[in-house]
Amino acid sequence: MVHFTAEEKAIIMSLWGKVNIEEAGGEALGRLLVVYPWTQRFFETFGNLSSASAIMGNPKVKAHGKKVLTSFGEAVKNMDNLKGAFAKLSELHCDKLHVDPENFKLLGNVMVIILATHFGKEFTPDVQAAWQKLVSGVATALAHKYH
């Protein structure tokens, strides 16, 4: 279980309140699909994923990215119980979707990159450390149901 200090929680919550969920979510999922093309196999119904520009402009990628980042908001609200907050999503991704849990780590790292690009100098090393801890905790929580 990940333990967050009061300062880390404040840092995460402060930045989260400024995140444009739709924009950052689409960018994060799009970047994941471009940088790690093998992840595209989980999104075969999304249509054209043939190039970086096709992926980044794909409305289904943007919509699902928003959904992913919206659910990530549950992590921000439940930092003290990430495992519980993501139990159902862990089960879905393990039992039904068969997503390799390593992909959760990749998406988390991409998310940190997106936040850094969006917030620039405001994304200090302390902010990055807190967010890296959160995305790592979420990846672990999502991987919980895997055997």
UniProtKB/Swiss-Prot annotation:
Domain Globin per the UniProt entry, residue ranges: 3-147
Sites where the protein binds heme b = H64, H93
Tissue distribution is: Red blood cells.
Q: Name one Pfam family in it.
A: Globin
Gene Ontology CC: blood microparticle; haptoglobin-hemoglobin complex; hemoglobin complex
Give yes or no: UniProt keyword NADP: no
Q: Which UniProt keywords apply?
A: Heme, Iron, Metal-binding, Oxygen transport, Phosphoprotein, Transport
Give the highest taxon in the source lineage.
Answer: Eukaryota
Instruction: List all membrane-crossing ranges.
Output: none
Record-level GO BP terms: hydrogen peroxide catabolic process
Residue(s) carrying Phosphoserine? S14, S51
Question: Could you tell me one molecular function GO term of this UniProt entry?
Answer: peroxidase activity
Q: Which SUPFAM superfamilies match?
A: Globin-like
- Protein task: The epsilon chain is a beta-type chain of early mammalian embryonic hemoglobin.
Which family does the entry's similarity section mention? Answer: Belongs to the globin family.
What subunit structure does UniProt give? Answer: Heterotetramer of two alpha chains and two epsilon chains in early embryonic hemoglobin Gower-2; two zeta chains and two epsilon chains in early embryonic hemoglobin Gower-1.
Record protein name field: Hemoglobin subunit epsilon
Native species = Otolemur crassicaudatus (Brown greater galago)
